[in-house]
């Protein structure tokens, strides 16, 4: 679940097509990923993406063809700025 409050602005730094799907890398800049683990969700321009790799200064996510067909993600390019929000946890203050 997300609040809709943007925590940081990141940047798309890599796009790797895989069949009809896509793997993308987001550089997070000022977003603290210290509490993020593989499998966590991060809203990226409002699209809920699951973290599959954590290289240190960002994250990788796999995007299905269904997500590509039903969001604006297909139009994202390397260099596209994206709004970021980590998913809420049971301990998150609202």
Task: Set out the residue ranges of the language-model regions.
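Conserved loop->alpha-helix
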Residues: 1-94
């Amino acid at each position: 679940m997300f609040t809709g409050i943007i925590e940081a602005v990141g940047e798309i730094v890599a796009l790797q097509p895989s069949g009809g799907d896509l793997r993308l890398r987001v550089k997070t800049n000022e977003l603290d990923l210290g509490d993020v683990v593989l499998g966590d969700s991060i809203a990226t321009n409002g699209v809920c993406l699951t973290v599959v790799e954590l290289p240190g200064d960002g994250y990788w996510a796999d995007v299905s063809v269904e997500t590509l067909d039903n969001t604006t993600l297909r139009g994202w390019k390397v260099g596209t700025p994206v709004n970021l929000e980590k998913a809420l946890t049971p301990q998150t203050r609202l």
